[in-house]
């Protein structure tokens, strides 16, 4: 990965005008979220458009994706990334805050995804864009409740979060967690991230685990399997 962009098998993500660069969290969510039967998809806080592009690759030809990003420079770059991809007809980018979009839209979505801000408010940050991307004071519960406003009755919401933040969200939301994947950066280490899927109706929980690196510091086979449609070296 360079400071200007990241090349995947079927598309390029330029991110030099985005506060948050392409990273493992977004790649995990884009590869893990369940796109089966998802015709209308919403990516909240889209940044460079990474997750929207991954879901465009994985979803059916009939699927349509709305990518919402508050920062003007990032939204424009996400739009350019989408237009340069094989799925420019599937992705529409909106430069808007998530509250306004989810309040104003009449669309109801089958799948909503987000890699929301995760650092605590009050910590000094180097520039305003990164402050917006990483330190925004809205809670993860607020993000989930905002997403729920435009969720279809049988729709799903998928987040990627630090483990502690995910545990807190599970205790505070009234939605049902129907899928959970605990992510270990390395075999033998405690999980640091969690992928969560919520729904409005109860379903049996699908609980799994993913390891990124094995004990020999090589990519674990499960991580390769999950992401092999995207990474050039897999």
UniProtKB/Swiss-Prot annotation:
Compartments, as annotated in UniProt: Cytoplasm
Role noted for this protein: Specifically methylates the adenine in position 37 of tRNA(1)(Val) (anticodon cmo5UAC).
GO terms under biological process: methylation; tRNA processing
Enzymatic class: transferase
EC number: 2.1.1.223
Keyword flag Transferase: yes
Gene Ontology terms, MF aspect: nucleic acid binding; tRNA (adenine-N6)-methyltransferase activity
Record-stated family: Belongs to the methyltransferase superfamily. tRNA (adenine-N(6)-)-methyltransferase family.
Catalytic activities: adenosine(37) in tRNA1(Val) + S-adenosyl-L-methionine = N(6)-methyladenosine(37) in tRNA1(Val) + S-adenosyl-L-homocysteine + H(+)
A GO cellular component entry from the record: cytoplasm
Protein name: tRNA1(Val) (adenine(37)-N6)-methyltransferase
Pfam family, one: MTS
Taxonomic lineage: Bacteria, Pseudomonadati, Pseudomonadota, Gammaproteobacteria, Pasteurellales
Keywords on record: Cytoplasm, Methyltransferase, S-adenosyl-L-methionine, Transferase, tRNA processing
């Amino acid at each position: 990965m360079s400071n200007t962009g990241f090349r995947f098998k079927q598309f390029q993500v330029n991110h030099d005008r985005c506060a948050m660069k392409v990273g493992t969290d977004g790649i995990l969510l884009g590869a893990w979220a369940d796109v089966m039967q998802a015709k209308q998809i919403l990516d909240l806080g889209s940044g460079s458009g990474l997750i929207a592009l991954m879901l465009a690759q994985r979803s059916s030809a009939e699927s349509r994706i709305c990518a919402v990003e508050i920062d003007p420079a990032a939204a424009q770059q996400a739009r350019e990334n989408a237009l340069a991809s094989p799925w420019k007809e599937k992705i529409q980018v909106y430069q808007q805050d998530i509250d306004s979009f989810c309040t104003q839209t009449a669309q109801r979505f089958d799948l909503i995804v987000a890699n929301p801000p995760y650092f605590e408010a009050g910590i000094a940050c180097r520039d305003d864009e990164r402050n917006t991307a990483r330190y925004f004071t809205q809670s993860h519960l607020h993000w989930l409740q905002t997403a729920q406003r435009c969720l279809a009755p049988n729709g799903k919401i998928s987040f990627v979060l630090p483990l502690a933040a995910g545990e807190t969200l599970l205790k505070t939301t009234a939605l049902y967690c129907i899928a959970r994947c605990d992510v270990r950066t390395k075999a033998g280490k405690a999980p640091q991230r969690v992928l969560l899927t919520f729904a409005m109706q109860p379903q049996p929980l699908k609980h799994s685990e993913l390891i990124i690196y094995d004990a020999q510091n090589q990519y674990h086979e499960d991580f390769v399997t999950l992401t092999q449609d995207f990474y050039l070296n897999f």
